[in-house]
Amino acid sequence: MANKIETLSKIQEVGIVAVVRATSIEQAEKITDACIAGGVAAIELTYTVPHADKLIEAMKAKYNSGEIIIGAGTVMDAATARIAILAGAEYIVSPYFDPETVKCCNRYGIPSMPGIYTPTEAVAAMECGADVLKVFPGDIATPSFIKDIHGPIPNAVMMPSGGVDVDNVKDWIKAGAIACGAGSSLIKGAKTGDYDQITETGKLFVQRIKEARAEMAK
C-alpha cells in the first residue's frame, strides 16, 4: 500500500477522480475498467454500490501495479471507513465532515477527504487532520468558491465533486483545485451500456486538465 504522500501526489498528478456509482459489482467493474482505459487512474468506489467492500478488494487485486489508486466514497462513518481501509481502500471520501471518520483515516495513515461547503466546515476539517477538502456539491459552489476560500485560508487543499464536467473542469483546476471528482458526467454511458463513451470522456477530462495546467504555467 502506498503511503499517504504518494497517494495524494498520484491523485494530484492525474487530476481527475472517477466517482463510480452502479447497481451491481459487475457494472461497477465495467465502469472502472472503462475509466482506467481512458487514463483516469484515480477511482472512487462509492458505498452506494452493493457490497462495496468486496468491489474494493476485487479492484485492488485486479489493478495491483501501484499505478491505479483505488479509494472509497460515500463513506458515512468511521466504521465504514475502517471496513473500506481493511478491504484495501487507499483514500476515503465522505459527503460531509465527520471527525471520527477523519480520525480513523489518520489512525491507519490513509488520506481523508470530507465534504465541506463553508469556511467554518473547512477549518474544522483541517484542524481535525483532513488531507483534502471535498467541495460538495460542486455544481452549487462553482469554481469561485475555491478562490474565495483561498483568500483567508490559502493552505486549504480542495477537490470539487458534483457538477464537474469537461466544460468546466479547466475552470476548477485554474481556480486552485488539487483535482476534480467526476461522477455522472463521466460515467453516464453506463446507463446504456456504452462503456466506450466513458473511456472517451475520461480521455477528454485528462486532456482538459493537462491543458489547464499548461496554461497556468505560462
Model-derived segments and their meaning:
Residues 21-23, 70-78, 94-98, 114-119, ...:
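Glycine-rich beta-to-alpha transition loops that act as phosphate-gripper elements at the mouths
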Residues 45-46, 85-87, 108, 118, ...:
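Glycine/Thr-rich beta-alpha phosphate-binding loop at enzyme active sites
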Residues 31, 77-87, 120-128, 145, ...:
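Catalytic cores of alpha/beta
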